[in-house]
Regions:
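Class I (Rossmann-like) S-adenosyl-L-methionine-dependent methyltransferase catalytic domain
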Residues: 1-69, 104-159
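Alpha-helical scaffold elements within enzyme catalytic domains, especially in hydrolases
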Residues: 47, 94-97, 227
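Cell-envelope and extracellular/periplasmic
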Residues: 78
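Short functional linear motifs
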Residues: 88, 92, 211-214
Length: 283
């Protein structure tokens, strides 16, 4: 991000494991294949590997090789506090995509910050950014200087609600997730890769969402479009939503369709979305 080029300079060269990772290790919640996302210099992975775990480092600056598999446990220690909101959103999406369906991620954030925004780094003498962070995930641990959130895929958490989008099936394949929005593949796809972007809070249609929810949906639409392009290599897309029964809406919980299109999937694609009314596409 152009506005935050020095976030990597906030990584500390430590001689021991970080407090959140040691806490989680002592609590026995670190399982299976582990990823330290935003690992800095890699001290936590060094500690966990010495304890018999298989822990991979990923850091855009210090360990830039992006992981090519999914993980049982993902750690993200003090990363979000030094990122701009749009960078935070990207991290949340990437971690959701790297986590196995039954896995858990732990986001540690600082609770002792006194100053917010840009400041001059006391060692490197360049502007670095910091902010307070609150997530709508389970608060797993908290003290005066640290809070650890536990994240699981939205599709894997039974929240007691009845709606198919408020409490989606654990069999639904998650594509990506943000704090307020998630994406899954459509159960009855129009084409290969047909995906849905769904706000977690139930609203009847797009125009009842808050501005923040609309922004989150737009971020997710762009992310899912990129994922589908890489995975299915379509020739085009139809993206949109139905509002009210007259427009074909059957589930009254806002959801945005992302429908990949392929050359030859219909005889004459001219007019695209105009074809919701037969005969109106060819004009």
């Amino acid at each position: 991000m152009k506005g935050n080029p020095n976030s990597h300079l906030t990584a500390k060269e430590r001689d021991k494991v970080s407090y959140p990772t040691r806490k989680l290790y002592n609590m026995g919640v670190i399982k299976g294949d582990v990823l330290d996302f935003g690992s800095g210099f890699g001290k936590d992975a060094e500690f966990l590997n010495s304890k018999g775990f298989s822990c991979t480092n990923y850091d855009p600056h210090y360990f830039p090789d992006y992981p090519d598999k999914k993980f049982d446990t993902i750690l993200c220690q003090y990363v979000l506090n030094v990122l701009l909101p749009e960078e935070q959103a990207e991290v949340l999406m990437l971690i959701s995509e790297l986590l196995k369906p039954t896995g858990k991620a732990y986001f540690s954030v600082r609770r002792d910050l006194k100053r917010f925004g840009y400041r001059t780094h006391y060692v490197h003498k360049v502007p670095t950014y910091q902010c307070n962070v609150k997530l709508p995930y389970k608060s797993f641990f908290k003290n005066d200087f640290c809070e650890i959130y536990e994240y699981r895929h939205f599709t894997q958490v039974d929240n007691g609600k009845e709606g198919i989008f408020e409490n989606p099936s654990p069999d639904a394949e998650l594509i990506s997730e943000l704090a307020t929005v998630y994406s899954i593949y459509d159960k009855f796809p129009v084409s290969k890769g047909h995906a849905l972007v769904i706000p977690k809070r139930k609203t009847a249609n797009y125009f009842e969402m808050t501005d923040k929810e609309k922004t989150a949906c737009q971020i997710m639409v762009e992310r899912v479009k990129d994922i589908l392009t890489k995975k299915f290599n379509p020739d085009g897309f139809n993206i949109g939503f139905n509002i009210n029964e007259a427009a074909g809406q059957t589930v009254f919980h806002t959801h945005i369709h992302i429908i990949p299109r392929y050359k030859g999937d219909v005889e004459n694609p001219r007019g695209g979305i105009r074809n919701v009314i037969p005969g109106m596409g060819d004009y």
